[in-house]
Amino acid sequence: MSNSCDLTGHGWQNGNMVSHSNRKTKKRFMPNLQRVTVFSDVLKQKFRFKVSAKTIRTIDFKGGLDDFLRNTKNSKLSKSALVLKKRIMKKVSGDGTNDRKA
């Protein structure tokens, strides 16, 4: 699964390319994957991921990697993202000083 997002697990999709004359040919739609390094404020550590452009925009919108993982449902995250989310939640619950939305 090299063509999938490390955080959300979004991969390629199959579909049809439809011409002007309405001919249909099979097409594989690949996600726009980028290698990014993201910093976790809670863990004080950098993480390198291969993520889709949509996920990068969502991380920026949510306010960083920590808030993205905390506010995203577990069903929408990949297994590696769930492991990282668990580490972040454990660190936040054990240390009351990391409440960023005060």
From Swiss-Prot:
Highest taxon in the source lineage: Bacteria
Keyword entries, A-Z: Ribonucleoprotein, Ribosomal protein
Region ranges (Disordered): 1-27
Any Pfam family: Ribosomal_L28
The keyword Disulfide bond is annotated on this UniProt entry: no
Entry's Gene Ontology molecular function annotations: structural constituent of ribosome
One of the GO BP terms on file: translation
InterPro entries: Ribosomal_bL28, Ribosomal_bL28/bL31-like_sf, Ribosomal_bL28_bact-type, Ribosomal_bL28_sf
Residue spans of biased composition, Polar residues class: 1-20
Cysteines paired by S-S bonds: none
A GO cellular component annotation in the UniProt record: cytosolic large ribosomal subunit
Homology family: Belongs to the bacterial ribosomal protein bL28 family.
Stored HAMAP family: Ribosomal_bL28
PANTHER family, alphabetized: 39S RIBOSOMAL PROTEIN L28, MITOCHONDRIAL, LARGE RIBOSOMAL SUBUNIT PROTEIN BL28M
Official protein name in the record: Large ribosomal subunit protein bL28
Species name: Neorickettsia sennetsu (strain ATCC VR-367 / Miyayama) (Ehrlichia sennetsu)
